Amino acid sequence: MRVLPAVLCALALCAACSEPPQKEIDRAQGALDAAKAAGADQYAPEAYTAATSALQQAHDAVAQRDYRLALSRAVDANERALEAAREAANGAARARSEAEAALPPAEASLQQLRTKLRAAEAARVPSIQLASARRTAANAQRALQEARKGIGAGRYLAASAALKDLPARIGVEMKAIDQAIAARGTRRRR
């Protein structure tokens, strides 16, 4: 009597693995598609790649008629895709926060640069010495517009990239303007 349940379980397992686990593969593909829609390829690339790899291994196992391995890989791909979607949500929130936090310092730096440009013009610094600072101000304005547009469209990494090192670049130009104003002032005194 004890042998009969064991034989029935073995037969059930063999029957379950005699066909490709299409339902599980489809579920994993759906989870992978949802993870991509959530931005997992950008915000959780390692988890997304692992899920994609596991799903490919499931397809490879089906091609080799190893349905037990295919089932295992499909379930693994589904779990990894769900994890990638969770990580993507966290990554997107973190990227949004970083992009939004980078806006005020960049805007303040641009405003300071514009103020320095006006002061340099009032001090009659030659226009050619201010050309680089004016280009930087125009580029900074474009970068800020791109960043705002990126944040509005949910492209947080692009927004952060647009603002990367912007205050530092503006700082270099402000220092050059200060030097030009100081040089202009010492020439006047002579």
Please provide the spans of the model-predicted regions.
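Sec-dependent bacterial lipoprotein signal peptides
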Residues: 1-15
